[in-house]
Amino acid sequence: MATIEDIKETALIPFQKHRQLSMHEAEVITLEIIGLLCDSECKDEKTLKYLGRFLTPDMYQDLVDERNLNKRCGYPLCGKSPERIRDPFSMNDTTKKFLLENNPYAYLSHYCSKFHFRCSQFYQVQLSDEALFARTGVHLFEDPEQDKHDIDFKVTLFEELLREKASEEDIKSLISGLKKLGLNPDSGTTEKDDTELEDDLSKWLAQIKIVENDNPSILGDFTRED
């Protein structure tokens, strides 16, 4: 399992003498991070949130794709395999795109469950589009603008949001918030889509309440839905 210290040691140590990264240095950091997590997973939520400092949405998608190539769930907090493992080279891009857009269970080729699919979506839409080399000082272990980095690249995990909103009356407001972030299931959201998402949230919130009473393991251990 990868920790914040692993990320620092693997990707950041060589670049501690200057605040401004070159494009090449930023690419090296990105490749090291993807290499570290393509066949492993983040040890805890804190580590995944720390990664948000260095990732763009496109870089995150590259990480998901690399994890899938290694038969791992795309969500970096998970150590399981996707529910449905497919050979990524068995179809062309057109066929792949068609399946993703028309198969309601296409996410199971990339994630172990719908829950981690939602978690991954929620994480990705919060990532900054700003190039890593433009994020001055974000890679430094000690920087006078650390507090600013914490604010600028702050990421809230879906699991955290559910824990904070763990009551039935908050479901609709949570759905509204997800839509504002562009987290609707498809670009043309329908009433059926809204109902499906609401049902998902109701189910997960109910399981959270059980977790709080029985003190089991983390949310990431949710099994897939039938």
Swiss-Prot record:
Matching Gene3D superfamilies, A to Z?
1.25.40.820
Q: Which domain of life is it from?
A: Eukaryota
* Hydrolase in keyword set: yes
Where on this chain does Zn(2+) bind? Answer: C73, C78, C112, H116
BP GO terms, sorted: transcription by RNA polymerase II
| UniProt xrefs under PROSITE patterns | ZF_RTR1
The cellular location(s) given in this protein's UniProt record come to:
Cytoplasm; Nucleus
Task: State one molecular function term (GO).
Answer: zinc ion binding
Q: Which chain segments does UniProt annotate as zinc-finger regions (RTR1-type)?
A: 50-136
Which catalytic reaction applies to this protein?
O-phospho-L-seryl-[protein] + H2O = L-seryl-[protein] + phosphate; O-phospho-L-threonyl-[protein] + H2O = L-threonyl-[protein] + phosphate
What does the record give as EC number? Answer: 3.1.3.16
Q: Which UniProt keywords apply?
A: Cytoplasm, Hydrolase, Metal-binding, Nucleus, Protein phosphatase, Transcription, Transcription regulation, Zinc, Zinc-finger
Substituting C73S results in: Loss of function
**GO-annotated cellular components:** cytoplasm; nucleus
Protein family according to the UniProt entry = Belongs to the RPAP2 family.
Q: Which PANTHER family match?
A: RNA POLYMERASE II SUBUNIT B1 CTD PHOSPHATASE RPAP2-RELATED (PTHR14732:SF0)
* Role noted for this protein: RNA polymerase II subunit B1 C-terminal domain (CTD) phosphatase that dephosphorylates 'Ser-5' of the CTD and regulates RNA polymerase II during the transition from 'Ser-5' to 'Ser-2' phosphorylation.
Note the subunit structure: Interacts with RPO21.
What more does the entry say? Present with 5480 molecules/cell in log phase SD medium.
**What protein name is recorded for this chain?**
RNA polymerase II subunit B1 CTD phosphatase RTR1
Q: What is the lineage of its organism?
A: Eukaryota, Fungi, Dikarya, Ascomycota, Saccharomycotina
